[in-house]
Amino acid sequence: MADITDIKTILYTEKTLNLQEGGMVVIQTSPKMTKTSLKAVLKEYFGFTPLKINSLRIDGKVKRFRGRLGVRDNFKKFYVKLPEGVSLENVGA
């Protein structure tokens, strides 16, 4: 089972800030995290059960590092619908 260390960050972009007004938050995690494990982590560490979770797997880009090809890390993004009255402000900032 995944734990809190698999959550990398909460994303703060222009798009995610617009989603936060509607009660959504976007969380970047390691690729091995699943919806059920994220739900368990949010319940255990933050004390709430999300209403809905959508996931998106993103492959790392191929980039050049000092003339050689390298690959950035793969990760998952989760779009989490928060219950009324719950916010994750100042977490991961």
Curated annotation (Swiss-Prot):
InterPro entries: Nucleotide-bd_a/b_plait_sf, Ribosomal_uL23-like, Ribosomal_uL23/eL15/eS24_sf
Keywords, comma-separated and alphabetical: Ribonucleoprotein, Ribosomal protein, RNA-binding, rRNA-binding
GO molecular function, one term: rRNA binding
One record GO biological process: translation
GO cellular component entries: ribonucleoprotein complex; ribosome
Pfam families xrefs: Ribosomal_L23
Top-level taxon: Bacteria
Key word Methyltransferase present: no
Function: One of the early assembly proteins it binds 23S rRNA. One of the proteins that surrounds the polypeptide exit tunnel on the outside of the ribosome. Forms the main docking site for trigger factor binding to the ribosome.
Family: Belongs to the universal ribosomal protein uL23 family.
Subunit text: Part of the 50S ribosomal subunit. Contacts protein L29, and trigger factor when it is bound to the ribosome.
HAMAP family: Ribosomal_uL23_B
Protein name: Large ribosomal subunit protein uL23
